[in-house]
Amino acid sequence: MKKTFCIVSFVFINSLFAYSQTTISTKDIYEFPVRQGTKEWLQFETIEKRIAALQIPDTVLIKISTEGLLETCLEFPYLTDIFFCDNFQHSFEALMDEFNGFRELFKRRDLTNVLLEKYKCLTVDVKGIRLLKDVEQGMFTFRYFVLEFMLTQDAVLNNLTEEQEKQLFFLSFEHKKIKQNYSDIFGSLNDLPINLLYVKKIMNDSDFKFENAETKKMLSDFIQAPLVIDQRIIDLIENKYINAKYK
């Protein structure tokens, strides 16, 4: 996947790495051999060669913990590629294709537990967000978005136990409150993963009755290309179905 990076993305990812290193306690995070802002980074003739150098060696990949692998993926230098397309699902699938860390992560049997635990920890981490500088707040909400988007992937949702499903939706209620309380920091884009989660849930429930075929198609299209959806529809789904089922 060909890419052109602007200075903003360059600064953002460098800062993202610095921020994550100060907030993560996982010991076996893979340290990428090249980083933006270094001579080595600029010496690569093509982006493809640079991405090849960023792959995790097989000897490391089989030993790294799922927690460490998740944090490594969240530090992948080209993680912002998820925003370089108007279809976030396609962008995420492209990240899976280009980085072996993501591919390995989604093979792990304990991925769901690790994602849920990380998601739970974010409810605590966010309490200090107002103490961060604007750029750091942006980094935090970006990682927040990516983590929530991972939780909406079919590989996760289709393998949830009943207890994990309850936990996920309970946490989603907590995170919706957080975003409302910090609406000056979280943009509307941060609502997308939870919206997608709710839509996927009702689309897979044969008992849910749609108002009309047009609404069903709109929701189906949103799953295929998650970007924008009428918030009134989401509110209706949440109030009449999600809340009744999980609260």
What residue ranges belong to the model's regions?
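Non-catalytic all-alpha helical scaffold/repeat segments
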Residues: 21, 28-247
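Sec-dependent N-terminal signal peptides
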Residues: 4-13
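C-terminal segment of classical bacterial N-terminal signal peptides
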Residues: 14-19
